[in-house]
């Protein structure tokens, strides 16, 4: 069972991916992790990737697909996997298909932009411990202070509204196109992944219940 989760940053994909991994005993595959592992192990593809990256270039889709094929052939992927951060573009999705890598489920977790901004820009962190708060959903006992130490909380650069809106812009211009791509594939029928859209405004538990219902049908 190979799964792709789509949705904007902050939609809850990471949380749901962890729950899926635990329930179905499948790994979450990150292209970044694959690249780092291949470079560390000195594999042929890893050495090629290292050379490209050291020269300031972008690792090609062809090379990434090669890494994906190596990764999914490993024993822990026998029951399937969740793709994390890949594909990001239609050419990458087409490259997956052309390499004969089948996808069983594509699930979109939909959340409006303004809710994403609210979720992410409200986060505050205690740098020393990594404890994370939210000014509305999980506020500290004393505004701006860590509950344990009383030290100042900070807003990470990634959680600034300007940064969030830039990330959303990138999502809409690139990755969101995959929604239409996979909807079309699902409609085509034979050997196509299923496509489902879930309302990410609901609680984690409710979204999880719907996700599991979809995946249990074809387990």
Curated annotation (Swiss-Prot):
Please give the residue ranges the record annotates as the region NMP.
Answer: 30-59
Q: What is its main location?
A: cytoplasm
Q: How does it assemble?
A: Monomer.
Any idea which positions bind AMP? 31, 36, 57-59, 85-88, 92, 156, 167
The protein's matches in Gene3D superfamilies, at most eight in alphabetical order, are given as: P-loop containing nucleotide triphosphate hydrolases
Question: Which pathway is it part of?
Answer: Purine metabolism; AMP biosynthesis via salvage pathway; AMP from ADP: step 1/1
Q: Which Pfam families match?
A: ADK, ADK_lid
Q: Does the keyword Translocase apply?
A: no
The entry's protein name is Adenylate kinase
Its function, per the record, reads:
Catalyzes the reversible transfer of the terminal phosphate group between ATP and AMP. Plays an important role in cellular energy homeostasis and in adenine nucleotide metabolism.
Gene Ontology BP annotations = AMP salvage
Keywords noted in UniProt: ATP-binding, Cytoplasm, Kinase, Nucleotide biosynthesis, Nucleotide-binding, Transferase
Q: Which GO terms describe its molecular function?
A: adenylate kinase activity; ATP binding
* Catalytic function, reaction form: AMP + ATP = 2 ADP
Identify the SUPFAM superfamilies for this entry: P-loop containing nucleoside triphosphate hydrolases
Entry EC number(s): 2.7.4.3
The entry sums up its family as follows:
Belongs to the adenylate kinase family.
In terms of domain of life, where is this protein from? Answer: Bacteria
- Residues noted as binding ATP in the record, renumbered to the chain: 10-15, 123, 132-133, 202
> In the UniProt entry, what is the domain comment?
Consists of three domains, a large central CORE domain and two small peripheral domains, NMPbind and LID, which undergo movements during catalysis. The LID domain closes over the site of phosphoryl transfer upon ATP binding. Assembling and dissambling the active center during each catalytic cycle provides an effective means to prevent ATP hydrolysis.
Q: Where is this region: LID?
A: 122-159
GO cellular component labels = cytoplasm
